[in-house]
């Protein structure tokens, strides 16, 4: 087994927690996988795995090697895909899952361009805020904005966007414009409830950092709902520029406290665990990544 294949085998062993799980993914014998890892450890003269009755876990050196090996394997796959893409016509059906706000604001407006590039390809787009099982539902690629809740997913970051404190001019005319993060505690804040994100936010300005616990009368578990509440003048929100791109461009909402930085929000392409992403899925991820890097303002799908 060559070095890159051995690195891929090691990655799959760590992800699966066993030689048998990795062997099943690679469609090869368990003994062959075990031998490949042993040869890899011998080659680099470092123990990568701890073997016990509870399974296999990476050593400290193994964890470092895992991260670097994963990047190397992904880069090699991207190089192969790029070479194939130059001569291969994509065809068949691509199944995409996207969350509602991200799908509506960031994916749908760009879909015509992707379909124009690949006339032999059909697309099924599932727009849903639930965390669905990609394998069980036959999804080729999922698109998420924000922190990923499942660390075992095969994921690729495709974009990053600044968060802002955003409200309508009408709301600010009534409630006043906050001059500091602490002033937000006196405002109605539309709270977007997420599993990994509470209502406390850290604002940075140079070396200064201020944490503020935000509160308000309205809480939602939907980004689309947060948009609707802000546009209805019910309050302000901490939100990505993506979420309000059309309104920011039209100046029907405005950002405040712009000299303070909030943690950015990241967009991810995720692929079914345990198998290599298809050429169609990788092509779509690359397309969205390129499109979102062109400019901060994105077109919207009007109702």
Sequence positions of predicted segments:
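Short helix-boundary/capping micro-motifs
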Residues: 12-27
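Conserved amphipathic alpha-helical core elements
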Residues: 40-41, 253
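Short helix-loop hinge/linker segments at domain boundaries
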Residues: 53-56, 63, 74-97
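Flexible hinge/capping segments at coil-to-helix
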Residues: 152-163, 167-190, 206
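C-terminal effector-binding regulatory domain of bacterial HTH transcription factors
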Residues: 67, 120, 241-254, 260-303
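Residues within the DNA-recognition helix of helix-turn-helix
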Residues: 29-32, 36-39, 110
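A short LG(V/I)-centered, amphipathic sequence patch enriched
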Residues: 41-58
């Amino acid at each position: 087994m060559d070095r890159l294949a051995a690195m891929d085998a090691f990655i799959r062993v760590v992800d699966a927690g066993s030689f048998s799980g990795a062997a099943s993914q690679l469609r090869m014998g368990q003994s062959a996988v075990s031998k490949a890892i042993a040869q890899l450890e011998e080659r680099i003269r470092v123990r990568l795995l701890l073997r016990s009755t509870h399974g296999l876990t990476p050593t400290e050196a193994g964890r470092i090697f895992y991260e670097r090996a994963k990047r190397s394997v992904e880069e090699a796959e991207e190089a192969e895909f790029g070479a194939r893409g130059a001569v291969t016509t994509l065809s068949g059906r691509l199944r995409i899952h996207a969350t509602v706000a991200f799908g509506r604001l960031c994916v749908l407006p760009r879909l015509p361009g992707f379909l124009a590039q690949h006339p032999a390809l059909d697309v099924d787009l599932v727009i849903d805020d639930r965390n669905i099982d990609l394998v069980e539902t036959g999804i080729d690629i999922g698109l998420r904005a924000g922190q990923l809740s499942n660390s075992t997913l095969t994921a690729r970051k495709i974009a990053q966007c600044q968060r802002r404190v955003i409200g309508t001019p009408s709301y600010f005319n009534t409630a006043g414009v906050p001059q500091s993060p602490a002033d937000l505690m006196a405002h109605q804040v539309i709270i977007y409830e997420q599993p990994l994100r509470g209502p406390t936010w850290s604002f940075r300005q140079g070396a200064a950092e201020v944490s503020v616990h935000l509160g308000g009368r309205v809480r939602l578990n939907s980004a689309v709902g947060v948009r609707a509440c802000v546009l209805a003048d019910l309050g302000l929100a901490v939100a990505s520029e993506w979420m309000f791109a059309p309104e920011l461009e039209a100046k029907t909402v405005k950002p405040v406290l712009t000299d303070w930085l909030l943690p950015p929000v990241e967009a991810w392409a995720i692929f079914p665990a345990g198998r290599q992403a298809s050429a169609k899925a990788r092509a779509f991820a690359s397309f969205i990544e390129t499109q979102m890097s062109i400019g901060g303002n994105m077109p919207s799908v009007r109702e």
